[in-house]
Amino acid sequence: MTRVRRGYIARRRRTKIRLFASTFRGAHSRLTRTITQQKMRALVSTHRDRGRQKINFRRLWITRINAVTRENRVSYSYSRLIHDLYKRQLLLNRKIPAQIAISNRNCLYTISSEIIK
């Protein structure tokens, strides 16, 4: 069987992979086989962490809202606030009240007191 000279095509493919892995440390940025393995691993990690990031931010927003609502009113909690928001048909996602809780706590207090009425 004759030898096939791949030419620039294989080199172009490898350099493309090397550019992706240029910030990796050690052999992970130098050796072609380990570069491809690490690239696959990195892409799997980014795909997984994109989903996990949404979960983590939602948890953070819930924690912030709950902390401010419990601080202002002793008997009031996050779950009761969200329930009252839905009862009043106020379409606020958890990101907006969390941002209000950080920047202006009194504003969140007035919103919650208006909902209770």
UniProtKB/Swiss-Prot annotation:
KW Oxidoreductase (keyword) present: no
Listed GO CC annotations: chloroplast; ribonucleoprotein complex; ribosome
CDD domains: Ribosomal_L20
The organism's place on the tree of life at top rank: Eukaryota
GO molecular function: rRNA binding; structural constituent of ribosome
SUPFAM superfamilies: Ribosomal protein L20
InterPro entries on file: Ribosomal_bL20, RIBOSOMAL_L20_CS, Ribosomal_protein_bL20_C
Compartment annotation: Plastid, Chloroplast
GO biological process: ribosomal large subunit assembly; translation
Record keywords, A-Z: Chloroplast, Plastid, Ribonucleoprotein, Ribosomal protein, RNA-binding, rRNA-binding
Gene3D superfamilies per record: 6.10.160.10, Ribosomal protein L20 (1.10.1900.20)
Function: Binds directly to 23S ribosomal RNA and is necessary for the in vitro assembly process of the 50S ribosomal subunit. It is not involved in the protein synthesizing functions of that subunit.
HAMAP family found in the cross-reference section: Ribosomal_bL20 (MF_00382)
Similarity annotation: Belongs to the bacterial ribosomal protein bL20 family.
Annotated protein name in UniProt: Large ribosomal subunit protein bL20c
Organism: Chloranthus spicatus (Chulantree)
Name of encoding gene: rpl20
